[in-house]
Amino acid sequence: MRAERTSFLLALGLLVAGIRSVHCLPENVVVKDQHRRVDGHTLASSNTDFAFSLYKQLALKNPNKNVILSPLSVSIALAFLSLGARGSTLTEILEGLKFNLTEIQEKEIHHSFQHLLQALNQPSNQLQLSVGNAMFVQEELKLLDKFIEDAQVLYSSEAFPTNFRDSEAARSLINDYVKNKTQGKIEELFKYLSPRTELVLVNYIYFKAQWKTPFDPKHTEQAEFHVSDNKTVEVPMMTLDLETPYFRDEELGCTLVELTYTSNDSALFILPDEGKMRDLEAKLTPETLTRWRNSLQPRRIHELYLPKFSIKSNYELNDILSQLGIRKIFANADLSGITGTADLVVSQVVHGAALDVDEEGTEGAAATGISMERTILRIIVRVNRPFLIAIVLKDTQSIIFLGKVTNPSEA
């Protein structure tokens, strides 16, 4: 093993706003779905558990700020990385992703992600969604044939030879790739690249959906959004009268409203009672989400007020992943399944998200909070203070975006 280890970066780019789906599986690769895989419920539960764990750490690190991420993008990228991990490094990654390795084999996990990627990239007239992976490889770096094959077949990954010694040119190449795949929403995923970088893995998600019941722009007006007890901002507030799934959770002290897209996927808006945000965040679990979804019932909302906004985020996840138990990849990694030698170490995990909400629907993700007023005959929902949002794909029960909107006026 060399005394000085070379850099390996994991990037997570995501977005919304697009015109077409992108299919990354090479045309010459025929996949036969004959392998055992984790059942859909188990994969969704593990991904949801990881999603909430990741969100909680980001919320702690970014108090009183907007928090927007795609936990699915992070899960896919780490699972992709685990293809080349060995020993305790592999165990840390998979257990960090909330898989019980006494019940599930590594091979089953990879085939489950393969199946998920294929399902997500199915063409649809109602939804613009594509998920893809890419490898940027130092020109003289020799990857193992097994890793290249598994990356293509299981994770639909593209590969690009890259000269990282010219770090600015390499940075531009990767940022331009992500910008193109996200229709310009993620413009600068990497702000810096070391000349010692050998390999960069990128995952992106592109998502755009239309509300099943769109808002009328003529009814959008400026209104107050209460960021905190002593801060109020003006935001464009959309309004709508509709029947939609609703649940009042007395046990956890929150109100939920679900808005569906034409694809029947949905955005779940969650408003904790005054002073209950931290308590609610602490109780976010897969079981909580399942209970909420089973409890939602159609109700007539006579006046729904929802802010129109566009926000972005960019996170370095090294410390947060370490808090979740994924540590060895940053210091004492065994990633010998990539090159055959254990001299690669992950130097940076970067995650970027861009989210837009308007009268037509969601680009990237939607974020809104819910404040509710109720009379005997009328339900009025005012999205006018901090709230949580989860965008869930119906067929796979995958949370593609998760966040907290504290101030919708901040880009």
Curated annotation (Swiss-Prot):
Compartment annotation: Cytoplasmic vesicle, Secretory vesicle, Chromaffin granule; Secreted
Highest taxon in the source lineage: Eukaryota
Residues bearing attached sugar chains per UniProt: N100, N180, N230, N264
Temperature dependence of activity: Stable at temperatures up to 70 degrees Celsius. Incubation at temperatures above 70 degrees Celsius rapidly decreases inhibitory activity.
Tissues where the protein occurs: Detected in all tissues examined (at protein level). Abundantly expressed in liver, kidney and spleen. Lowest levels were observed in diaphragm muscle.
Record Gene3D superfamilies: Alpha-1-antitrypsin, domain 1, Antithrombin, subunit I, domain 2
GO molecular function: cysteine-type endopeptidase inhibitor activity; serine-type endopeptidase inhibitor activity
Keywords: Cytoplasmic vesicle, Glycoprotein, Protease inhibitor, Secreted, Serine protease inhibitor, Signal
GO cellular component: chromaffin granule; cytoplasm; cytoplasmic vesicle; extracellular space
Pfam families: Serpin (PF00079)
Site (Reactive bond): L377, R378
Post-translational modification: N-glycosylated.
Endpoints of the signal sequence: 1-24
pH effect on activity, per entry: Stable in the pH range 4.0-12.0. Incubation at a pH below 4.0 rapidly decreases inhibitory activity.
The family this protein is said to belong to: Belongs to the serpin family.
Its biological purpose: Potent inhibitor of the serine proteases elastase and trypsin. Moderately inhibits the serine proteases plasmin and chymotrypsin, and the thiol protease proenkephalin-processing enzyme. Does not inhibit the serine proteases cathepsin G, furin, kallikrein, thrombin, tissue plasminogen activator and urokinase, or the cysteine proteases cathepsin B, cathepsin L and papain.
Assembly description: Homodimer.
Protein name: Serpin A3-1
Gene: SERPINA3-1
